[in-house]
Amino acid sequence: MTNIRKTHPLLKIINSSFVDLPAPSSLSSWWNFGSLLGVCLGVQILTGLFLAMHYTSDTATAFNSVNHICRDVNYGWLLRYLHANGASMFFICLYLHVGRGLYYGSYTYSETWNIGILLLFAVMATAFMGYVLPWGQMSFWGATVITNLLSAIPYIGTDLVQWIWGGFSVDKATLTRFFAFHFLLPFIVTALVMVHLLFLHETGSNNPTGIPSDPDMIPFHPYYTIKDILGFLVMLTALATLVLFSPDLLGDPDNYIPANPLTTPPHIKPEWYFFFAYAILRSIPNKLGGVLALVVSILILAIVPILHMSKQRSMMFRPLSQCLFWLLVAVLFTLTWIGGQPVEHPYIIIGQTASALYFLIILFLMPMTSMVENYLLKW
């Protein structure tokens, strides 16, 4: 008798995706981040759902409702900090997942890669709108500054900003619509994740060598299910440690001050996971130029497959490209640090240098290095 998991219309989809899926035998721990992102998304949706039961999206009561959740709701403080720090964990896993794709050449699966870029934008939009909801000082001013960037768009900019705000400033209408979209977007993200997996399973997984692994495949269960569960335990332990010992480590103290349109915080900045993009934005003195650089800094991922000049897919056997990749990582860490610093000397020049290096490495140095490596292979 055939196993029910192979015949049942619903179970056979799950079976072909998570049980009998043929997977390369050489996948390292860098391949754990996809499943970790799935867990992060689940944690965020669950904690967010329970927070939404107690939150009120009104400028008069939003700050107090978050206060009420932390003080009066059973384990409300735990839900709130799991949700806030869960977002940080989400982005850590997201950036490591993208980094893995860049290092091992996973971007050659163009459909999967492009859906991934869409996912990155959707998650960033969700996180930005979530940061506005507690209605603290940094929530209000962050929303004002970031949405105001759209006014740099020629001709329609000002009208577009006022349309997003629902008035002439960030106010009740803005908060209400941000809450609505913040609730909706994670479900759109979930749908995109399914499309992402659909395209991935059309081609099968890449592997660290970048060499086709068709002759050497193993079933996903039990080998990679066990490996993923270990990843879950490590990540959830790290998240629990952060939430229970220093929940405000990655937050901004200014967000414990209720939003006040009459006083501006000394340094307006977004959450830490946007610092690298914020540093690139600030490194260009022109408003429109800065906005374009900000968008291009992430959209540049879409042209990475076109810039792939190497005869090898993975960087595993390309030491020169490896050096450049780790230089790029160092540049991104530098940009993240600069994004959280005030706009003054020497941070301005460091930010501008790091921004220039970021684009230089991806657009010129990496393709040129790949061509040099191709030439060296002939020897």
Swiss-Prot record:
The organism's place on the tree of life at top rank: Eukaryota
Gene Ontology CC annotations of this record: mitochondrial inner membrane; respiratory chain complex III
Binding annotation for a ubiquinone: H201
Binding positions (heme b b562): H83, H182
List localization entries.
Mitochondrion inner membrane
Binding residues for heme b b566: H97, H196
- Entry keyword Chaperone: no
Cystine pairings recorded for this chain: none
Q: What does this protein do?
A: Component of the ubiquinol-cytochrome c reductase complex (complex III or cytochrome b-c1 complex) that is part of the mitochondrial respiratory chain. The b-c1 complex mediates electron transfer from ubiquinol to cytochrome c. Contributes to the generation of a proton gradient across the mitochondrial membrane that is then used for ATP synthesis.
Stated family = Belongs to the cytochrome b family.
Against PANTHER family, the record matches this protein to: CYTOCHROME B
Q: What is this protein called?
A: Cytochrome b
Q: Source taxonomy lineage?
A: Eukaryota, Metazoa, Chordata, Craniata, Vertebrata
